[in-house]
Amino acid sequence: VTGRCHRACWYCPLSRERKGRDVEFANDRRVTSPSDVIEEAESMSALGTGVTGGEPLLVLDRVVELCTLLKEHFGPDHHIHLYTGLAPDEPVLECLRGLVDEIRLHPPHESWPQILETDFARSAVLARRMGFAIGIEVPALPGIGNLAPALPLLDFLNINELEWGETCAAAMRERGLEPEDGLHNAVLGARRWAEELPADQKVHFCSSVFKDSVQLRERLKRIAANTARPFEEVTDDGTIVYGVLEPTGALDGFLESLDEDDYAVCEGRIEMAWWVLVDHGAGLPGKKYVVERYPNGGMVVEVTPLDAAIQD
């Protein structure tokens, strides 16, 4: 709901286009109105919403407006959880009651050794009494075992594997940290730090691989199921694949030979089922290629030229 934040955590992975800026995004889409948020939620048949920042409670009125809209549109069973680096007091919690189902607190790293003496512990007790599900969600950092005394106050303690990011890379290098490998964003040693916490059913660990490979893939698949055009193939990763022809001459009745669901005429190009383009491309004048991208007009993952392959 905003990229603004009152803190400057050295490990914050928020991207440059969001960090420190009062901008709103729904998933990866920049939104400028409440209706944009509803449209994005509907595009993936969302069963719930996570409200994040920056710091959401810096724009409390915005949070209340959006959560009210979501509950009214999708019904009371639409689960809403909110992340915050603040310790909400009773007036703030009262504003959120009936709208936010679950609060995930992010106490600053330096407060962990005295966690029971902080406003976060007091906020957890108050929120639980007011009917919220309440927990702590933080990255795996050295000293995370200091949070164990707070477990009796919480419904959960979520630990995210510390991740390397563009905006926090310099700070991580200064601390002697490095990526686990060249394929993933996990920081070397983060999983070991998480092991400081006792085995407890309230403690949950989310690996970087799970977040990137499972959570993102499932979200993309939900969006693709609702938004893919009839001629687009949905992959196991949730991306969509289609063929593109940029014609430079007459197509001699080619489009008339296709079913209407097999193509779409766009400005300067024709988008179609990739297998149709592969099968018939040799006789068509113009540039031909296959596109793989995130669904609903999302990021392009790969473009494969077909001209040479068709000639071969």
Which residues does each PLM region occupy?
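Canonical Radical SAM [4Fe-4S] cluster-binding loop centered on the CxxxCxxC motif
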Residues: V1-V31
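Short Fe-S-cluster ligation motifs
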Residues: S33-E55
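Acidic (Asp/Glu)-rich catalytic clusters
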Residues: E39-S43, L96-L99, A124-V125, L151-P152
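Short, acidic/turn-prone active-site loops that include or flank metal/cofactor-
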Residues: P107-W112, E161-G165, V290, Y294-N296
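Canonical radical SAM enzyme core domain
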Residues: K19-S35, L57-G98, E102, H106-T118, ...
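Short, well-ordered coil/turn segments that N-cap beta-strands
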Residues: S45-L47, P76-I80, L99-D101, M130-F132, ...
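Conserved C-terminal portion of the radical SAM core fold
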Residues: D119-V214, R229-G243
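Radical SAM enzyme core and accessory elements
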Residues: V234-D312
